[in-house]
């Protein structure tokens, strides 16, 4: 039997977290392109061995994280550690908060996907559409009402900006939760995602990944559901300290992040109903007949369940139907109603993204912010209920996908007779 000695094993590949050394640069359009071929995006597959590909991707992602976090800080955002009593060297998860959080009348909270780093919508969008477009930078600029920098200035300041953070004058604050970086890397003393954990340096290229133990768990943030609860209970519930007593909260939930928020609010809606203004979901994963009811089996949960239905105007289900909406993958133009209200308990709209679920937020965030403004301006706002069905066209000719007939009404009462939309 042949045995390889450790010194004879392939060394683990190492790539620098530097765009130029990786062979890439930021264009005038804020996109990441190859230096050798300015028309080519990031090339993931550079070797038949997947370990080389993963190591290079993690180095690129580290560059992007540095740039995005630098730009967020330039806009007056800072990091907050959870648990709140954790020191920088103790296990904690960082979230981003705007500097006006304690004084703002409105707070927009974003719960992202567990597969993404904080502040990143999708790495594929960052490379192809632009760093700001694929991250929370554009959203922060819009919500905090900051004057946007031109791409050239941001490029000169990346990856580390020497510019002073802009002063936030808006009465709307922003919180970027961190449902992805929930693994504590003891050696690096930082929280990382599962993808980053798998890309950590190893003794050789053929060694297995490190085994996780209890030391890699973050107290109160062991998974994305716990992290969502931690943001609500440690940050948003800190009335008079971290947020204003009368602050209204808008929630953006992306995939599992939205599912966690829905489950938490459904389990304790009576406590949070005075403060939640509206909910907007990207790629919703909850089901109205399951997740809109509390998932605990104690007496309080049973009492919530009795009142948490659409027939009760004070229930969470009624609130989500009236002041909630979702954006999903669809071939339809952005903003067109699509089927989904029966599954998710709220109106569903096309996001403008046809293929990738992770790209929905980057495509639909502007619509979300505009809708939040509309709902905030009208305390009595109530969404029309869109019943979208697909029917055959007249004469037996059926276009590809059929024809969608959208009925808009309140309390299942049709108020417009239906609008036909070719799909």
Language-model-derived ranges and their functions:
Residues 148-170, 189-215, 240-243, 297-307, ...:
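Intrinsically disordered, low-complexity domain-flanking/linker segments in eukaryotic proteins
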Residues 269-401:
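The feature captures the conserved acid-bearing segment of alpha/beta-hydrolase catalytic domains
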Residues 84-189:
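Short, surface-exposed "cap/lid" segments of acyl-processing enzymes
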Residues 134-137, 141, 176-243:
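Alpha/beta-hydrolase active-site loop
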Residues 1-36, 352-423:
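Long C-terminal extensions of eukaryotic subunits of large macromolecular complexes
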Residues 249-261:
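Gly/Ala-rich beta-loop-alpha elbow adjacent to hydrolase catalytic centers
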């Amino acid at each position: 039997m042949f045995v390889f000695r450790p010194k004879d094993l392939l060394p683990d590949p190492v790539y620098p977290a530097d765009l130029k050394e990786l062979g890439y640069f930021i264009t005038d359009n804020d996109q990441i392109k190859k230096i050798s071929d300015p028309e080519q995006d990031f090339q993931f597959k550079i070797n038949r061995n997947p370990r080389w590909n993963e190591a290079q991707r993690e180095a690129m992602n580290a560059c992007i994280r540095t740039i995005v976090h630098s730009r967020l800080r330039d806009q007056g955002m800072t990091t907050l550690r959870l648990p709140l009593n954790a020191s920088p060297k103790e296990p904690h998860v960082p979230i981003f908060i705007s500097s006006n959080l304690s004084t703002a009348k409105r707070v927009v909270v974003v719960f992202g996907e567990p597969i993404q780093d904080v502040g990143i919508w999708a790495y594929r969008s960052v490379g192809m559409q632009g760093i700001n477009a694929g991250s929370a930078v554009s959203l922060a600029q819009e919500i905090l009402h900051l004057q946007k920098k031109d791409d050239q200035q941001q490029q000169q300041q990346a990856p580390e900006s020497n510019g002073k953070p802009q002063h936030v004058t808006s009465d709307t604050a922003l919180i970027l939760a961190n449902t992805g970086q929930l693994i504590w890397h003891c050696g690096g003393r930082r929280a990382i995602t599962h993808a980053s954990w798998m890309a950590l340096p190893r003794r050789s290229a053929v060694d297995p990944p490190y085994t996780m133990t209890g030391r890699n768990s973050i107290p109160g943030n062991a998974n994305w559901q716990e992290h969502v609860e931690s943001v609500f209970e440690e940050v948003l519930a800190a009335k008079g300290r971290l947020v204003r007593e009368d602050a209204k909260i808008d929630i953006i939930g992306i995939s599992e992040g939205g599912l966690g928020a829905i489950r938490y609010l459904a389990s304790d809606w009576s406590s949070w109903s005075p403060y939640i203004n509206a909910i907007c979901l990207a790629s919703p994963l909850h089901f109205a007949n399951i997740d809109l009811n509390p998932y605990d089996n104690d007496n309080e949960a049973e009492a919530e369940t009795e009142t948490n239905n659409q027939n009760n105007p004070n229930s969470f289900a009624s609130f989500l139907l009236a002041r909630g909406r979702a954006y999903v993958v669809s071939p339809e133009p952005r903003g067109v109603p699509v089927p989904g209200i029966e599954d998710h308990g709220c109106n569903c709209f096309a996001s403008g993204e046809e293929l990738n679920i992770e790209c929905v937020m980057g495509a639909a965030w502007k619509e979300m912010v505009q809708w939040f403004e509309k709902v905030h301006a009208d305390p009595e706002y109530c969404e029309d209920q869109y019943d979208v069905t697909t029917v055959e066209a007249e004469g037996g000719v059926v276009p590809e996908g059929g024809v969608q007939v959208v009925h808009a009404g309140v309390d299942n009462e049709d108020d417009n007779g239906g609008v036909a939309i070719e799909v």
